[in-house]
Amino acid sequence: MKVATFIEPGKMVITDTPKPVIEQETDAVIKIVRACVCGSDLWWYRGISKRESGSFAGHEAIGIVEEVGTKVTDVSKGDFVIVPFTHGCGQCPSCKAGFDGNCTNHQAAKNVGYQGQYLRYTNANWALVKIPGQPSDYDNETLNSLLTLSDVMATGYHAAATAEVKEGDTVVVMGDGAVGLCGVIAAKMLGANRIIAMSRHKDRQELALTFGATDIVEERGDEAVKRILDLTNQAGADAVLECVGTEQSVDTATQIARPGAVIGRVGIPQNPDMNTNNLFWKNIGLRGGIASVTTFDKSVLLDAVLTHKINPGLVFTKSFVLDDIQKAYEAMDKRDAIKSLVIVD
């Protein structure tokens, strides 16, 4: 089978590898239908973070269950499923509290190679999300939106939920990648009255407005702080969705949040140090982390996509076949695509 493989920064290739098989009774083998490139993949693609040469890539997909282990009872062969990057069990205290991204029973579970023809998905019971029908029952737009439920839409929703966005709030969304844009959708779903999206790129600004943003802020740093405080009559935001992960973005978030606000942080941290003084002096809460993908998909997001209440699949602005995986990464690296869709045959 074919699978996307990392060679070195800036170089992705397709390699042949044996088709995966059931190794544990909790496994499922998935035939991938659609996958994609994540903004987090660019950290190692650009050489900013380390990754072993020859490792398989991808952590977002939808597909068809090919085979299941004897202890997998929630899905069966032939089911159409969302394949999350998380592996919740649905039974531990973390999962029951709604934080399946931190499942205590499956802490070591992590699969890669979703950008391939087949995937062995470990700890499959409960974690996989069954989609009614088959891929042929849906148009391309809906399939793309279903694909976002494996990561970016659920992660954007996690940012808004942990930031405790509620009816009438003023929300700032930091980051105009797919997660940030999905955060705009999530803030609107949760009732935000004003959504300020931080973006310097026209195509992303337009999509943010389509998704429900009311204001666009192009500035960064101190200028961004001044602009947002001016927009909020010096009050600051009720909630901030931090979807970047840099030290500057977290610092900016603490400055634009009003006293008592909550920051929902889903940007992968790129610096081990963080100044928490502003959090204390302003009574600001900092939450967020690994998204509760299965929890949010099953409780709200799958229904929202199937009933066309949201259309997060619009974040896919370029489409590629699996053999063109290098081009898919290049398009995102050069910002020619907001998010690259990968069609797997």
Residue positions per predicted region:
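Adenosine-nucleotide cofactor-binding segment
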Residues: 173, 188-252
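N-terminal Rossmann-fold NAD(P) dinucleotide-binding loop
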Residues: 180-181
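Glycine-rich beta-strand-centered segment in the early N-terminal region that forms part
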Residues: 20-35, 48-93, 112, 132-139
